[in-house]
Amino acid sequence: MAFLKKSLFLVLFLGLVSLSICEEEKREEENEEVQEDDDQSEEKRGFLDVVKHVGKAVGKAALNAVNDLVNQGEQ
């Protein structure tokens, strides 16, 4: 009976250790995914900033061109 108890405790202990290791690996994978998502959102944010600046420049150029045409038409 004592042998059976020791075997059972050993099996439970090893199962608990393996479960703990699996949970730790799962947490690490989730953290890596979160970091990848953060990196991707930063890249998107950087891309949108570039698009915004280009849009402003194009808008200003178009506005200046329209103003020049209007001023030429008035003269």
UniProtKB/Swiss-Prot annotation:
One of its GO terms (biological process) is defense response. Expressed by the skin glands. Residues 30-41 have a biased composition (Acidic residues). Residues 1-22 form the signal peptide. The keyword Secreted applies. Residues 23-43, 74-75 form a propeptide. Residues 25-44 are annotated as: Disordered. Has antimicrobial activity. Belongs to the frog skin active peptide (FSAP) family. Cruzioseptin subfamily. This is Cruzioseptin-12. It comes from Cruziohyla calcarifer.
